[in-house]
Amino acid sequence: MLDTVPPERLLARADLCARWAGLALGVVVAQRLAVRDSDDVAMTFLSAVTAFGLCAVGGVLLGDSLTPAPVEAVRTASLAPRRVRDHVPPRMAPLLLFQTACLVVLLMIGAATASPDSMSRASRAVTVTCRGATRPLGPWPGIHYATPILASVALGTAACVWALRRIAHRPGGNQQRHDRSWAITAAWGLLVSSQLLLVLAMIGRVLSRTTCAGMLGNVTALVIYPLGLLTLFSLGWCLFTIVMPRAVGDE
């Protein structure tokens, strides 16, 4: 007698393949964007990072759409309402929200302090005065770079929130909702963490190119470098959560 694969297993494999496909497509698109000719290297890398994050989100959302909720034979009403926060990672979700807040704050500060670069292109550098000489240093996360970052984060956040609400209120077991919610949270976190890491790299590069940052520069360094390590940890967790197999068919 031939062994048959349960439909739940096939759907779980389709979900995992969609996630891997999203990451693979993101790598291909990011590579093509990274090697294109441009006089703005920072925007080139920003476009590549943004494309990778959005493709990862798209792959996870596609995988979720390929796994329809099971049709329950008996529906029973629950007195406790289903909430999104009951299914997302209890520790990583607050951390990712904190990183999102840090990203927004850094972009606001960057936009407020940005100035034209050496080629008179607006909002791409920060003016530094050192030993009586004033010069622009960049790239700096001014409005020129903040606009695509905020647009991509807003788009990814809206899509992931919609998916999380849909998962929380549709039929199915708690384990399935848990698995889907974790994967979508990780995809959103990958988008946010990668953008934050790029912004921190911009600020760190500017600080490394001047010796006149003073106390403010030292305080900034004490903030962004630990935040960078924390962001790297979040990025690794998000990647691992996206690619690891789900337990959809194990209930």
Please give the residue ranges for each predicted region:
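Generic multipass alpha-helical transmembrane bundles of integral membrane proteins
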Residues: G63-W182, L191-Q195
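Hydrophobic core of alpha-helical transmembrane segments in multi-pass integral membrane proteins
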Residues: V27-A30, A51-V60, C102-L107, L150-V161, ...
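Membrane interfacial helix motifs at helix-loop boundaries and amphipathic/re-entrant anchors
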Residues: V29-V49, M108-I149, A201-P226
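C-terminal transmembrane-bundle signature of multipass membrane proteins
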Residues: T157-I167, Q176-E251
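Alpha-helical transmembrane segments of integral membrane proteins
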Residues: R13-W20, T44-A48, P94-L97, A146-I149, ...
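Hydrophobic alpha-helical membrane-embedded or membrane-associated segments
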Residues: L16-A24, A48-A56, V153, A186-L190, ...
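N-terminal membrane-targeting/anchoring modules of bacterial envelope and secretion proteins
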Residues: M1-M119
